[in-house]
UniProtKB/Swiss-Prot annotation:
Residues 1-43 form a transit peptide. Its main location: plastid. One of its GO terms (biological process) is transsulfuration. It comes from Leucaena leucocephala (White popinac). One of its GO terms (molecular function) is cysteine-S-conjugate beta-lyase activity. It is found in: Plastid, Chloroplast. It catalyses: L-mimosine + H2O = 3-hydroxy-4H-pyrid-4-one + pyruvate + NH4(+). Belongs to the trans-sulfuration enzymes family. This is Mimosinase, chloroplastic. Catalyzes the degradation of mimosine, which is a toxic secondary metabolite found in all Leucaena and Mimosa species. Its EC number is 4.3.3.8.
């Protein structure tokens, strides 16, 4: 079943769909590039999606990503279990007195975790993937690629956890210089780069303002200086954006979010096509013991089977919610790259396969924003995103709480800014919930 099948279902015809041409995703996978911009129904022609059948002739075609993920299993398992076995073992017997087998110590590698790494590599179109205990431990490994005296250039409105790590450990203890710039303006990037810049740290879209950076052009500029380009791609999921194909060197996902999908484990992954970088990242993981446990890897493996369905449904709902907010007089601004009037709309469309399911908005009133967050019933008040359920928070007080107030103001993060992760619920229930939360002021 192709990723676009949701939009062939008459039961979901209330949402606008503008299907784009199919784009190859991963190694032999195909997903539809879907940017929906209206609330008028545009039905996909089922004929163009139907297989061409020739009686008596065997036809081989590349399976869609949803088909591959639903059928993926550990081909090394002698019992051919449909669910990957959990190798809950710290050690594995050696081949003989002087030779290891492929697996010998789970701090270095584990069969269950390796299976997850292989399937993430497939959908990332990456040669190498290394999994970690969390997204933050993955970020820590990336920072080990720079040395005292080096410079890191980061996106301005960076995730609060990344800001805290860079500021407290890299700047104060490691002697690293950090430059924070609005990377959505390419001129800022050009002006900030020097021969000391060894790492360019991007988020596109950024968290929480959903700003869009030109990954291709920034990669070109950074590589001219010999810098590594790293992308925190958490907001997009590995299905909607492939930064490695745009010139990035390393792509990070907090697998806690979209990959696992149920907010039931912590996990992180780093993908690259550079063997030297991959060896360094694996060496760091092995030395520090921050490799993903087989139990958490298994949770991610179970979750990733439904990743295409979840990403598609969440994105479909998000487009409807974003349009609702954009036309609501109580909302002063909506940050979402799926809206045509978003400053980064065209750029994002050129380097992704969809706008995703995370957005933020402003009301101009902290009391009203607090009321919305507190009064909604179907939006969990949590700091995470990417799960099956909708989530809502005020970044000033949650995900970006640790950032000093002057810095948050400089970044453009306001107290009334609301971040929303749209889930798979009935979208009309979500809109009614938001409408009810805004209907009667309690302040």
């Amino acid at each position: 079943m192709a990723l676009s099948s949701t939009f062939l279902n008459p039961l979901v015809s209330s949402v606008a769909v503008n299907p784009q041409p199919k784009i190859t995703s991963g190694k032999g996978f195909r997903v539809n590039c879907l940017i929906r911009t209206q609330q008028t129904v545009i039905k996909t022609d089922t004929k163009e999606n139907a297989a061409v059948l020739t009686p008596g002739k065997r036809v081989e075609k590349e399976p869609s990503v949803s088909t591959v993920l639903a059928n993926y299993h550990a081909d090394w398992d002698p019992f051919e279990a449909t669910s990957t076995p959990i190798y809950q073992s710290a050690t594995f017997r050696m081949k003989n007195a002087t030779e290891y087998n492929e697996y010998y110590y789970s701090r270095v590698a584990n069969p269950t975790t390796s299976t997850l790494e292989k399937i993430i590599a497939e959908i990332e179109n990456a040669e190498y993937v290394t999994c970690f205990t969390s997204g933050m431990s993955a970020l820590t490994a990336v920072c080990e690629l720079v040395n005292p005296g080096d410079e890191i250039l980061t996106v301005e409105d960076i995730y609060g956890g990344s800001y805290g790590f860079i500021e407290n450990l890299m700047v104060r203890k490691a002697g690293i210089t950090v430059k924070r710039v609005d990377t959505s303006n390419i001129e800022n990037v050009k002006a900030a780069m020097t021969n000391k810049t060894k790492l360019v740290w991007l988020e596109s879209p950024s968290n929480p303002q959903l700003k869009i950076s030109d990954i291709r052009e920034i990669a070109r500029i950074a590589h001219a200086y010999g810098a590594i380009v790293f992308i925190d791609n958490c907001i997009m999921s590995p299905l909607l954006s492939h930064p490695l194909e745009l010139g990035a060197d390393i792509v990070m996902h907090s697998a806690t979010k979209f990959i696992a999908g149920n907010s039931s484990c912590m996990a992180g992954s780093l993908a690259t096509n550079n063997k030297e970088l991959a060896d360094k990242l694996l060496s760091y993981r092995s030395a520090t013991g921050c490799g993903l446990s087989p139990q958490d890897a298994w949770i991610c493996l179970e979750g990733i089977k439904t990743l295409p369905l979840r990403v598609e449904e969440k994105q479909k709902n998000a487009l409807t919610v974003a349009n609702y907010l954009d036309n609501n007089p109580k909302i002063t601004k909506v940050n979402y790259p799926g809206l045509p009037d978003n400053p980064g709309y065209d750029l994002h469309k050129s380097q992704s396969k969809g706008p995703g399911s995370v957005m933020s908005c402003e009301t101009g009133s902290l009391p009203l924003s607090k009321q919305i967050v507190e009064d909604t019933k179907f939006f969990s008040k949590i700091v995470g995103f990417g799960g099956v359920g909708s989530a809502i928070c005020l970044p000033w007080y949650t995900s970006h709480k640790a950032i000093p107030e002057p810095e948050k103001i400089r970044m453009g993060i306001t107290k009334d800014l609301i971040r929303i992760s749209v889930g798979i619920e009935d979208v009309q229930d979500l809109i009614q919930d938001l409408d009810n939360a805004m209907s009667t002021p309690t302040f």
